Amino acid sequence: MPTTTRETYHHGDLRSALLRAAMAMLEAGEPFSLRAVARRAEVSQTAPYRHFADREALESALAVQGFRDLRLRLSLDGSPAASEDELVEFAVAYVLFALEHPALFTLMFGRECDDGNDERVLAAAELRELLAGSLRGLFPDADHDALATALWSVTHGLAFLHLDGKLPSGSTREVAERVRDSIAALRTAFSTPATASSTDGAAARTPTRVPEESSA
């Protein structure tokens, strides 16, 4: 089989080939540099520098691909969730994506974002807007920023708890049900009035303010 060289790539194909090689190395847990990726893609050692200034630029390009793939996983046509149940399925898809692509997910969220990479910033913003748009449509009177932070924190936390082995991964179905059950439990708890004993206990734990002494 003939060796692939940089001369065989058409315009735009070299970048795609480098990203495929880098993604394969990332998911396999192989440390990579631009030179290592070039060897994996079977191109010249200097070829990657045509598209990526350094390893950080290559990592940002992988993160961009990850954000876009995750957004498609949540909504193929980019439409916001049309119901609360669909919003919950967004959370399920988010966690399952993390388990299917652990190294990529960690690269996307577990490392400091390169704020100087406009494409990466935009891709992350588009993912956030999918959630924000869903919340605006479903809960028009809510504090959307606070609600988005809460929902993302729960979902993101579940993703990393599974990745870190703090929660058993099990089958896809088991993980999906755990995500659904967790969100359902929170919805139920916050929609149910606190019992008298709970409120009494909270009051008992509230420290009594001591009046300030008069200076007279």
Where are these regions (language model features)?
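Hydrophobic alpha-helical connector segments
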Residues: 75-104, 125-128, 151
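Amphipathic alpha-helical packing segments from all-alpha helical-bundle domains
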Residues: 115-141, 145-150, 173-185
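N-terminal intrinsically disordered/low-complexity leader segments
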Residues: 1-13, 194-216
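Append "Primarily bacterial transcriptional regulators
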Residues: 36-40, 48
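Amphipathic alpha-helical segments used for helix-helix packing
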Residues: 99-115, 160-168
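Generic hydrophobic, amphipathic alpha-helix propensity
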Residues: 13-22, 37, 62-66, 70, ...
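Basic, helix-initiating cap at the start of DNA-binding domains
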Residues: 1-27, 31, 56-60
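Amphipathic C-terminal alpha-helical segment
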Residues: 153-170, 185-194
